[in-house]
């Protein structure tokens, strides 16, 4: 596959709104009208339980991993980075949702880094798990994990292009969590629960 073809594939795969599709298929509802309105795994877990939510999380991760991995191993490292960035852009503004608001990029960005810079991905995953375990805030875990991306990029001495991707990804994830940050400041952010119930805003 060509450089341009893989970047296009990245955007198309990133545009697959798995949370929206799976909830439509298995529950007959619009996830955008439930809980926080997000199409990502966190909102799906809160509203419909772990099985459906974790499935969404895995698929959202894979749609970032696949184009990034293919680009790195079959074209060039830069292709993998740009294909991964395209997947994140697709997740944010999905073609299949007519470019309306998508997800917050956390799982998809994780998949991208597993495809292009696995040690960064592993480090960020550890940060997410530890932070979530201590706080039970998915938003705080995601923000801390995002902040750690460029740190791990420097620690493991990755290329300039990977470092740039880490900064861009961190900024994007933090920016997309700005409403969560506001709720954290006012003490109205909700801690995560795996109980099957309708989601409170996050």
Enumerate the language-model features and the residues they cover.
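Interfacial segments of multi-pass membrane proteins
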Residues: 45-48, 67, 71-76, 90, ...
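Nucleotide and nucleotide-moiety/phosphate-recognizing core
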Residues: 2, 6, 52-97, 119, ...
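C-terminal ends of transmembrane helices
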Residues: 19-24, 88-100, 128-135, 178-182
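Cytosolic, membrane-interface loops and tails of multi-pass inner-membrane proteins
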Residues: 20-53, 101-102, 182-202
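Short, non-helical or kinked segments that cap or interrupt transmembrane helices
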Residues: 29-38, 97-110, 137-145
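Loop-to-transmembrane alpha-helix initiation sites
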Residues: 122, 138-146, 157-169
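Alpha-helical transmembrane segments of multi-pass membrane proteins
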Residues: 10-15, 86-91, 128, 132, ...
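N-terminal signal-anchor transmembrane alpha helix
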Residues: 1-27
């Amino acid at each position: 596959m060509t450089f341009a073809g893989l970047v296009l594939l990245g955007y198309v795969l990133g545009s697959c709104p798995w949370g929206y599709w799976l909830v439509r298929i298995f529950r007959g509802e619009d996830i955008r009208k439930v809980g926080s309105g997000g199409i990502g795994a966190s909102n799906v877990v809160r509203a419909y339980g772990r099985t459906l939510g974790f499935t969404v999380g895995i698929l959202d991760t894979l749609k970032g991993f696949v184009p990034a991995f293919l680009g790195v191993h079959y074209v060039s490292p830069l292709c993998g980075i740009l294909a991964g960035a395209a997947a994140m852009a697709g997740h944010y503004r999905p073609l299949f949702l007519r470019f309306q608001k998508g997800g917050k990029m956390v799982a998809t960005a994780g998949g991208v880094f597993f495809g292009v810079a696995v040690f960064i991905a592993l480090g960020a995953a550890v940060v997410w798990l530890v932070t979530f375990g201590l706080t039970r805030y998915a938003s705080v875990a995601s923000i801390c994990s995002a902040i750690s991306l460029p740190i791990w990029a420097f620690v493991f001495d990755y290329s300039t292009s990977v470092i740039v991707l880490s900064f861009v990804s961190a900024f994007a994830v933090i920016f997309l969590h700005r409403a969560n940050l506001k709720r954290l400041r006012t003490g109205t952010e909700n801690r995560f629960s795996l109980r099957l119930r309708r989601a409170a805003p996050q």
